[in-house]
Curated annotation (Swiss-Prot):
SMART domains: RPOLA_N
Highest taxon of source: Bacteria
Lineage: Bacteria, Bacillati, Chloroflexota, Dehalococcoidia, Dehalococcoidales
Keywords: DNA-directed RNA polymerase, Magnesium, Metal-binding, Nucleotidyltransferase, Transcription, Transferase, Zinc
GO cellular component: DNA-directed RNA polymerase complex
GO molecular function: DNA binding; DNA-directed RNA polymerase activity; magnesium ion binding; zinc ion binding
Catalytic activity reported: RNA(n) + a ribonucleoside 5'-triphosphate = RNA(n+1) + diphosphate
Enzyme class, first EC level, given as a word: transferase
Name of the protein: DNA-directed RNA polymerase subunit beta'
Cofactor annotation remark: Binds 1 Mg(2+) ion per subunit. Binds 2 Zn(2+) ions per subunit.
């Protein structure tokens, strides 16, 4: 028998009425739910046991059959099948609707699918469906022709009759000798009357001719026409009419008609025909029928999915769906009754409209008109509301499940723990591991059965704790700190049982979790299965997660006290006890320190292991003892940055276990010496520099001059403002320099800031110098500086100005965190199916990585190429020696060699150019930065990329808070810029760019400012003459197109005429150059573009400049869509990567280019079809680039005409919604729209991404290579590194 879960794709499509009836176990005919006295479901009601199954396991409604032995029997008395009660979660019912009803998803969507198919506007459709207008459903052409003929006969008959009547009257008048005037008047009246009669008949004929299927008629028009021409046409209203029209559609004919229309029309009409064609193709390819968008049978959800529960006061709480179903059933029953008794048409029509509205409310309440409310103001939750939004079924229950075997507690620091350990409170561990402890108690014979084992555990006997110790030995636990921004926010640890109620966390993993000990809480999860335990131990243990996946930097680097302790340990103190003493080796120096003869930081001389005399300190000797032998003696002050570099270097030469031991030793050293340093901070440590008074007075003077010039009208408001800001910024910098110059290098404040433990020079300047300029809530700098320092105290006015900045910091924190989280969610969605699925895609393409022109704006070339694979040989520019072969990894040594060779650009493999049709290949991605090796197969690199970009987004957001609102770059400018780029939106301040290469001319006149770009491209056309041909033109001669340039030379004196088609003729007009047998015509083509420049924009070019296409003409940011249309795909990819990188790098956040490239690849993965050729593709359709190439290749192989298309740059939201997986798209945004489209197209989800597998409860298709499998590779690397030169010989970026 096939397993229920054994499937590899899910299809969604429209349900036919027959299919709905086949799902159903019976028709629900009554609106009742349960009997309020017996509390039993009413028969044929919404909770009927006969339809949906018994309420109690294996017990029918009347109680005749009880127990499992009657399973499957249907009670002859109450009609209930004997089964488990859980069938009430699966069994559906149905309602037979008295008249067809439109499904609101298909009638009211944008665009309305029914409207598009029938060529009706949404407004017209609404008029029909809600019974306000009639629509013609059929026209009898024969009857129409006959009616027209009859009308013409009647018309001529009437005219003839009237004519003879007039003739008789005229004859009579002539006999009575009437005046000529009177007779003429009668004739004139007849002429007018005849014209009126003909006009009336023509009007009726025109009305008949205008009757077309699908035309709308008002009620008056309908009755008027029906009275006269009842046999010519049929018209009706409501969903019934739409059902008829939809069932008449012949999809093949419609397709041919629309294809013709897309080829023969243009503009809006072509666009609409393209959309209609896509819809027709969708119905043709899927097995759906268009009439299924109109419902004649309504499915009823199983009752346990819309439960009704009794509350304490005898009242009932019920799902809103029951109320919505009740309304539908009531109206349906009433309509059936009215139709049976033959009620007037108007009453029936009104009841049909009410039924349509009831079904609309059930499916999607509030989409049309006023939403139905239950219990006063509470809006009823419809079926669509159950799916959409954060509380909907997708995001609340399918993607965010609750987890058992988990706990939560406050965290405290555990300085004595090993790196791979965490402290788990005994009581918590006992609850978490209860089943394991109970099993062990029974197995070891300490309890006879599980029940008594549970009692032992609940009484917490001493033997229970002994067994608990054994259980936790081989079971790691997962710790998670919310918000889970990247994969390092969940790590595995070996639990150590402790007393108390708080979790203990190793201090070195705090930065990975972004945790501190001010009341943070963390969750604990227990991996249950063997596979889960194996994965936790081999890939999730904290010792396997020491590097940041975003940049490859160490994440387990010491901080705060530990940094200060190591810095204090390695600094020198001039004049300290024992200074200048000489020792034979390190051990002797340490013994003297332990005996108290020399000071820890005294400068001494010692012979190292190689016999060289070193000038160092005992502290540095102690510090170097914990480092591996392969690392050269570190004879310098060790601040935070140096520790990071040392850890990065050691990671490459030590195993995970040795690395963990070394880190624990550094941690212990740091804590020990931070304690013995006796560091403290007092008011006396902060001294205001003497130069401050003079500098502030000079700045006041310059400010007064600027104010005076402004008062006299010599400068503008902007110039005054800029002058004041510049003055105070300069002054602030000078005061900062003065503070630095006057620092006590042995002082606590200086050491704290210099070591990188806490604080920076900006904060010290605010304490000792002056607070400086502040920003107001809008981000504008206030031109009134705070001249006091925090040491001196602020005046009342200064205090209130400073609160501006502080408040802005707090407000930004609250507002921007959500923005960053939403950006992360969109990034995750767009990349969730990017997984490493191929070893090598074999592409020869790549991307150029170029040394940035502006240092500090982008990372240096050496950092950007590290860990990438080359797409071309990297050759030394001077010697020609190959530094890196094609298709080889650039490691640290090769990267250093490239830097030293002065190479400024390298062609590397990139995710942007990877040709894997699904996911990505290992070579194009390169090194996994978190593991420092080539990325493993099945790694979810898309998720890693999204986390790497999103996690620092939140960090940047929160960073405003820590600077206390002092003037500086605020993420308010950074995060929206990143969002703008990833959403491919036009920038707020959009720069004008040139569409062509050419020479600039800036024009300024009364009509404003214009820039004209003129391009004169010189081309040449060459003609090679066979020998013996004679030229008919001279060099430098101007020739016109079509002029003869050369002809065959005739032999002898023959008079034969040369045929004109034998001559060489000029294809273009231009100037001739003749060189031997080669004639060249030089000609130029000129092109001009003119751009109007808005007054507020600053021009970046000047007259006479030569510029390239895509170059900026004005200030601002370039619209990525413009770059795509002018310079193409590669240029826009490069622009996106560099612009995003600039935002992060300027904030001091390091993200590897490849993460941004993964996102950019997803933004450009679709193409829009321009012409379909001989393929089944539809013009205007969005198709995956690789699928498009595949289809074209097949068509070309068969000798057909391929389709044409252009690349589309989509924002991450649009890209997520147009993903191949409808499950992933529906769980992201616009759930109902995605499901509507997917159902019509009959989409198949192949379950290739992560989200769709999580939704249906399968394992995700991403398994990393376990660390055990990687140990052999690592051992080889460590052996190679051990024989490598010592630390000083390695490049800076590998430290």
């Amino acid at each position: 028998m096939n397993e229920v879960n054994d499937f590899d794709a899910i299809r969604i499509s429209l349900a036919s009425p027959d299919q709905i009836r086949s799902w159903s176990y019976g028709e629900v005919t009554k609106p009742e739910t349960i009997n309020y006295r017996t509390l039993k479901p009413e028969r044929d009601g919404l909770f009927c046991e006969r339809i949906f199954g018994p309420i109690k396991d294996f017990e029918c409604a009347c109680g005749k059959y009880k127990r499992i032995r009657y399973k499957g029997i249907i009670c002859d008395k109450c009609g209930v099948e004997i089964a488990r009660a859980k069938v009430r979660r699966e069994r559906m019912g149905h309602i037979e609707l008295a008249c067809p009803v439109g499904h609101i998803w298909f009638t009211r969507g944008i665009p309305s699918r029914v409207g598009l198919l029938l060529n009706l506007s949404t407004r017209s459709l609404e008029r029909i469906i809600y019974y306000s207008h009639f629509i013609i459903t059929a026209v009898n052409d024969e009857a129409r022709a006959k009616a027209i003929k009859d009308l013409e006969v009647i018309s001529s008959q009437r005219v003839a009759d009237k004519g003879s009547e007039v003739d008789t009257r005229v004859a009579q008048m002539e006999a009575e000798d009437a005046t000529v005037e009177a007779i003429n008047q009668i004739r004139r009246d007849f002429s007018t009357e005849r014209e009126q009669m003909e006009e009336d008949i023509q009007l009726l004929i025109d009305q008949l001719k205008d009757l077309q299927k699908g035309n709308l008629l008002t009620e008056n028009q309908y009755y008027e026409l029906k009275q006269r021409f009842s046999n010519v046409f049929e018209a009706s209203m409501g969903a019934e009419a739409l059902l008829k029209l939809l069932s008449y559609i012949d999809m093949d004919k419609e397709r041919s008609k629309l294809i013709q229309e897309t080829r023969s029309t243009s503009g809006q009409r072509r666009k609409k025909a393209g959309k209609q064609l896509q819809l027709v193709e969708a119905f043709r390819r899927s097995s759906n029928k268009p009439e299924w968008m109109i419902m004649t049978v309504l499915p009823v959800l199983p009752p346990d999915l819309r439960p009704m529960v009794q509350l304490d006061g005898g009242r009932f709480a019920t799902s809103d769906l029951n109320d919505l179903y009740r309304r539908v059933i009531n109206r349906n029953n009433r309509l059936q009754h009215l139709m049976e008794i033959g009620a007037p048409e108007i009453i029936i029509r009104n009841e049909k409209r009410m039924l349509q509205e009831a079904v609309d409310s059930l499916i999607d309440n509030g989409r049309r008109g006023k939403s139905v409310a239950v219990n006063g103001d509470h809006k009823a939750k419809s079926l669509s509301d159950l799916l959409r939004g954060k509380q909907g079924r997708f995001r609340q229950n399918l993607l965010g499940k609750r987890v058992d075997y988990s706990g939560r507690s406050v965290i405290v620091v555990g300085p004595s723990l090993k790196l791979s350990q965490c402290g788990l409170p005994r009581r918590m561990a006992l609850e978490l591991f209860k089943p394991f402890v109970m099993h062990r108690l029974v197995r070891d014979g300490l309890a006879p059965n599980i029940k008594s084992a549970r009692r032992l555990v609940e009484r917490a006997r001493p033997e229970v704790y002994d067994i608990l110790e054994e259980v936790v030995k081989d079971r790691p636990v997962l710790l998670n700190r919310a918000p889970t921004l990247h994969r390092l926010s969940i790590q595995a640890f070996e639990p150590v049982l402790i007393d108390g109620s708080a979790l203990r966390l190793h201090p070195l993993v705090c930065s990975a979790f972004n945790a501190d000990f001010d009341g943070d809480q963390m969750a604990v999860h227990v991996p249950l299965s063997k596979a889960a335990v194996k994965e936790a131990r081999e890939t999730m243990l904290s010792i396997h997660n020491m590097m940041l996946p975003s940049s490859g930097e160490p994440v387990v680097s010491p901080s705060l006290d530990m940094v200060f302790g190591c810095y204090y340990l390695t600094t020198t103190r001039p004049g300290a006890k024992g200074e200048g003493k000489i020792f034979g080796d390190f051990e002797e120096a340490k013994r003297y320190y332990e005996m108290g003869i020399i000071d820890l930081r005294a400068i001494i001389k010692v012979r190292d292991g190689k016999g060289n005399m070193l000038e160092t300190t005992t502290g540095r000797i102690i510090f170097n003892d914990v480092l591996p032998k392969a690392v050269e003696f570190q004879n310098m002050d060790i601040p935070k940055s140096a520790i990071k570099k040392i850890i990065g270097r050691c990671y490459k030469i030590l195993s995970s276990q040795d690395m963990a031991v070394m880190l624990d030793k550094i941690k212990e050293l740091g804590f020990k010496f931070a304690t013995s340093s006796g560091i403290s901070i007092a008011m006396s440590d902060i001294s205001v520099p003497r130069e401050k008074t003079k500098l502030v007075a000079a700045a006041d003077e310059r400010t007064a001059i600027a104010e005076g010039q402004f008062a006299r009208g010599l400068i503008t408001e902007d110039e005054r403002y800029n002058s004041i800001i510049e003055t105070w910024m300069e002054t602030t910098d000078r005061i900062t320099d003065a503070i630095q110059a006057g620092f006590d290098k042995q002082g606590s404040v200086y050491m704290m800031a210099n070591s990188g433990a806490k604080g920076n020079i900006s904060q010290i300047r605010q304490m000792a110098g002056l607070r400086g300029l502040m920003t107001n809530p809008s981000g504008r700098i206030i031109d009134f500086p705070i001249k006091s320092s925090l040491r001196e105290g602020l005046t009342a006015l200064e205090y209130f100005i400073s609160t501006h900045g502080a408040r802005k910091g707090l407000a930004d924190t609250a507002l921007r965190t959500s923005g960053s989280g939403y950006l992360t969610r969109r990034l995750i969605d767009v990349t969730q199916d990017v997984i490493i699925l191929q070893e090598d895609c074999g592409t020869a393409n790549g991307t150029w990585i170029i040394e940035p022109k502006e240092k500090g704006m982008l990372p240096p070339l050496v950092d950007r190429i590290l860990g990438r694979w080359t797409a071309h040989n990297v050759v030394h520019p001077q010697t020609g020696e190959i530094i890196v072969d094609n298709n080889e990894e650039i490691d640290e040594i090769k990267a250093k060699a490239i830097g030293e060779a002065g190479i400024t650009e390298v062609f590397v493999r990139s995710p942007l150019t990877c040709e894997s049709t699904h996911g990505m290949c290992r070579r194009c991605y390169g090194r996994d930065l978190g593991r420092v090796r080539l990325v493993d197969m099945n790694t979810a690199v898309g998720i890693i990329a999204a986390q790497s970009i999103g996690e620092p987004g939140t960090q940047l957001t929160l960073r405003t808070f820590h600077t206390g609102g002092v003037v500086g770059v605020d993420i308010t400018t950074g995060l929206p810029r990143v969002e703008e780029l990833f959403e491919a939106r036009p920038p707020k301040v959009q720069s004008i760019i040139s569409e062509i290469d050419g020479v600039v001319e800036v024009i300024e006149n009364e009509n404003g400012r214009h820039i004209r770009i003129a391009s004169d491209e010189v081309y040449q056309d060459e003609y090679e003459l066979p020998s013996g041909w004679k030229t008919q033109v001279q060099s430098r001669q101007w020739v016109d197109s079509g002029m003869v340039l050369a002809s065959p030379e005739l032999e002898g004196k023959s008079k034969a005429v040369v045929q004109s088609d034998q001559n060489v003729v000029a294809r273009v007009a231009g100037e001739v150059t003749i060189e031997g047998n080669l004639i060249t015509i030089k000609y130029s083509e000129s092109e001009e573009r003119e751009y109007t420049i808005p007054a507020a924009m600053q021009i970046k070019v000047k007259t006479g400049d030569t510029i390239r296409a895509g170059q900026q003409l004005t200030d601002g940011s370039i619209n990525p869509q413009d770059i795509l249309s002018i310079l193409g795909r590669d240029a826009v990819q490069k622009y996106l990567v560099e612009e995003v990188q600039k935002v992060y790098y300027s904030q001091g956040v390091h993200i590897n280019d490849k993460h941004i490239e993964v996102i950019a690849r997803q933004m450009l993965i679709k193409v829009r079809i321009d012409s379909s050729g001989d393929t089944d593709l539809v013009p205007g359709e969005l198709v995956d680039k690789f699928r498009y190439e595949d289809i074209n290749a097949k068509v070309l192989a068969e000798g057909g005409e391929p389709a044409t298309a252009h690349t589309v740059l989509m924002g991450i939201t649009r890209a997520s919604l147009s993903t191949e997986s409808w499950l992933a798209a529906a769980s992201f945004q616009e759930t109902t729209r995605v499901l509507t489209d997917a159902a019509i197209y009959g989409r198949v989800d192949k379950l290739s991404g992560l989200k769709e597998n999580v939704i249906i409860g399968k394992l995700i298709p991403a398994q990393c290579k376990s660390c055990k499998e990687a140990t052999i590779e690592r051992a080889e690397r460590i052996a190679a590194a051990a024989s490598a030169p010592a630390m000083s010989g390695l490049p800076e970026n590998c430290l």
